[in-house]
Regions:
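Bacterial N-terminal signal peptides that target proteins for export
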Residues: 2-14
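Signal-peptide-cleaved, periplasmic/extracellular N-terminal interaction regions immediately downstream
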Residues: 2-5, 24-148
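Bacterial N-terminal signal peptides
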Residues: 12-23
Length: 148
């Protein structure tokens, strides 16, 4: 009887080890996310034309956003829910201009990932938002007098 138990012990032990290994492998692969599933902010660019100073937030897909104008500190706060930053500078100082002081990008990871961009303004300018397939264009009007 002891001999038959000894003969069964090694196959049972080997089976337990293999099942444990298989369970670990399947758990790890279930948690993997591909980059294609994530919304990313890939760049922040500033430009100017005769009428506007333009901040362009580029993404790998169409970006969902909420924009709130702030008085203290003066600027525009733009939140991008379920969107991460993709290796971009977190603080940007544009070339000398009459509109923008700086642009700061942060990634918040409370209750999911949200990216926040704060555009610090020198004066209270009117603005407009124009989303497209690759991001968001924010136009600060130069031709209007600063908002009061």
């Amino acid at each position: 009887m002891i001999d038959s138990i000894k003969k069964l012990f090694k196959p049972v032990q080997l089976s337990i080890i293999l099942l444990s290994f298989a369970a670990c492998v399947s758990q790890n692969t279930a948690n993997v996310k591909t980059v294609g599933e994530s919304k990313l902010i890939t760049d922040i660019i500033t430009s100017e034309d005769a009428q506007s100073t333009i901040v362009t937030v580029k993404g790998n897909v169409t970006l969902t956003y909420t924009a709130i104008k702030q008085e203290l500190p003066l600027g525009l706060l733009v939140d991008f829910p379920e969107t991460a930053l993709d290796n971009i500078k977190t603080v940007y100082y544009p070339p000398e201009n009459d509109t923008l002081n700086s642009i700061r990008a942060t990634q918040l990871e409370e209750e999911g990932v949200t990216s926040r961009i704060f555009i610090s303004l020198k004066q209270d300018f009117s603005y407009s938002l124009q989303p497209d397939d690759t991001g968001l264009h924010i136009y600060f009007s130069k031709t209007d007098s600063p908002a009061v």
